[in-house]
């Protein structure tokens, strides 16, 4: 019988499952090398914690790791039901809030190691968390893709810790009672990008689609389709970072100015950035709340101990 101890939280409605104990030893390398070991040798642990019957397609997993740098508070590897994420904004907020809940960190700024670089996260007195993300940038502006049923769709390609295709002019109603249509549209766009060889830098896959609309309570509202075809309940930290990079590139948002990004369910992140040459360094602030603490059991007699794979 294998066991995995977890602590679940949600950030703006989007869940994070922090893995505390039970995964194999991944060595002492950096987070990217440990992610590679996990992916190539022990991926069944990811599947067990993310896939049904113990997980679902909305969950983002965060494996808590001992950091390489002794000054860092934690290392983390992010994953979901389809594979691995370079960075996760809402997940980092969830991680920091969870560490505070466990009494492992106090109010202040903490260094967090991720597979795509180190980030700074600040736990505030009001228990909100600010994440100073990895450098973000717009890779290409106004890229056209031919999408079945919808014709030409134009969007920007940007990096915010993951690769995004950001669409402002889409003709879709961005509302919580239109989720099926938004999902179908965004998924069709993603398939078209793949089919037409439209990628991020160095051929990296664009696995997030982000649609924007106006909002009465924020500067913008978004719908973000994640790699596993689930929509992000939060405003998406890496997606908001990609948005900030595009706004900065267009001269529509000055360094230090606040941008309020709402999600499809109305939760909000507050974002700003610093200019760093051709890149921007986004800071995303949000709140996370604990939702469950549990031990997962993987019984050797259970045919679905390592997840249901369809």
From Swiss-Prot:
<dbReference type="GO" id="GO:0047580">
    <property type="term" value="F:4-hydroxyproline epimerase activity"/>
</dbReference>
<dbReference type="Pfam" id="PF05544">
    <property type="entry name" value="Pro_racemase"/>
</dbReference>
<comment type="function">
    <text>Catalyzes the epimerization of trans-4-hydroxy-L-proline (t4LHyp) to cis-4-hydroxy-D-proline (c4DHyp). Is likely involved in a degradation pathway that converts t4LHyp to alpha-ketoglutarate. Displays no proline racemase activity.</text>
</comment>
<protein>
    <recommendedName>
        <fullName>4-hydroxyproline 2-epimerase</fullName>
        <ecNumber>5.1.1.8</ecNumber>
    </recommendedName>
</protein>
<feature type="binding site">
    <location>
        <position position="208"/>
    </location>
    <ligand>
        <name>substrate</name>
    </ligand>
</feature>
<dbReference type="InterPro" id="IPR008794">
    <property type="entry name" value="Pro_racemase_fam"/>
</dbReference>
<feature type="binding site">
    <location>
        <position position="232"/>
    </location>
    <ligand>
        <name>substrate</name>
    </ligand>
</feature>
<feature type="active site" description="Proton acceptor">
    <location>
        <position position="88"/>
    </location>
</feature>
<feature type="active site" description="Proton donor">
    <location>
        <position position="236"/>
    </location>
</feature>
<feature type="binding site">
    <location>
        <begin position="237"/>
        <end position="238"/>
    </location>
    <ligand>
        <name>substrate</name>
    </ligand>
</feature>
<feature type="binding site">
    <location>
        <begin position="89"/>
        <end position="90"/>
    </location>
    <ligand>
        <name>substrate</name>
    </ligand>
</feature>
<keyword id="KW-0413">Isomerase</keyword>
<comment type="similarity">
    <text>Belongs to the proline racemase family.</text>
</comment>
């Amino acid at each position: 019988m294998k066991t995995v101890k977890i602590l679940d939280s949600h950030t703006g409605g989007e869940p994070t499952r922090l893995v505390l104990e039970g995964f194999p030893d991944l060595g002492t390398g950096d987070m990217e090398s440990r992610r590679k070991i996990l992916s190539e040798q022990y991926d069944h642990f990811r599947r067990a914690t993310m896939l049904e019957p113990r997980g679902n397609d909305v969950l983002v997993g965060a494996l808590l790791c001992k950091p390489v740098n002794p000054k860092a508070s934690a290392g983390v590897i992010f994953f979901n039901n389809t594979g691995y994420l370079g960075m996760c904004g809402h997940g980092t907020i969830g991680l920091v809030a969870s560490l505070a809940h466990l009494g492992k960190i106090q109010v202040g700024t903490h260094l967090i190691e991720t597979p795509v670089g180190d980030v700074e996260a600040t736990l505030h007195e009001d228990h909100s968390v600010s994440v100073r993300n990895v450098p973000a940038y717009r890779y290409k502006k106004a890229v056209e893709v031919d999408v079945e049923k919808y014709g030409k769709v134009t969007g920007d390609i940007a990096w915010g810790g993951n690769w995004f295709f950001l669409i402002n002019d889409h003709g879709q109603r961005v509302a919580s009672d239109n989720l099926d249509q938004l999902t179908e549209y965004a998924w069709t766009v993603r398939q078209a990008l793949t089919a037409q060889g439209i990628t991020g830098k160095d051929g990296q896959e664009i696995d997030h689609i982000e649609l924007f609309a106006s909002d009465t309570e924020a500067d913008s509202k978004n719908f973000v389709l994640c790699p596993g075809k689930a929509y992000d309940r939060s405003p998406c930290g890496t997606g908001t970072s990609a948005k900030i990079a595009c706004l900065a590139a267009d001269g529509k948002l000055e360094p230090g100015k606040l941008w309020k990004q709402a999600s499809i369910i109305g939760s909000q992140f507050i974002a700003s950035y610093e200019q760093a040459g051709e890149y921007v360094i986004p800071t995303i602030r949000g709140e996370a709340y604990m939702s469950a603490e549990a031990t997962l059991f993987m019984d050797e007699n259970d045919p679905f101990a390592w997840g249901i794979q369809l």
